[in-house]
Amino acid sequence: MARNVTAVKTRTNDSAKVDMYTVPAKNTAEIHMIYILASAGNEDADLYWYDSATTTEYPLAHAKALQSTNGEYLLLNELQIDLKENDILRVKNSGTSSSITYMVSMNLKPALATQFHS
């Protein structure tokens, strides 16, 4: 049975790339919405997907020079990005003088399992 999950992470005055959400073991996640909002400053914001099966990181979203004074944001709706167990969403601000909130909405459901009987 699937359930809706929203992961939220706010990064303030820090440009280090950090983990935002890890798909739990024996689950899959289907991303439907990505929302990135600047509440202070004027910097780039990046969202990444780390594929644990191939140990490869992919860029998912990039918001260039979001200005909090103008209420700028990036909204990607009606997506279908499938993640597998232990995949990781990561976020990174481009500088150290901003506050950016990242929100990702997804459906989380148990992974299909195959059993073999002798």
Regions found by a protein language model. Give the residues of each.
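C-terminal interaction-tip segments
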Residues: M1-A29, L37-A40, D51, N93-S118
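Residues that flank catalytic or metal-binding motifs in active/ligand-binding sites
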Residues: E30, E43, E85
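Short, surface-exposed beta-strand/strand-loop-strand elements in extracellular ectodomains
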Residues: G41-A61
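Short proline/glycine- and polar residue-rich coil/turn motifs
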Residues: K64-Y73
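Noncatalytic modules at the cell exterior or secretory-pathway interfaces
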Residues: Q80-S97
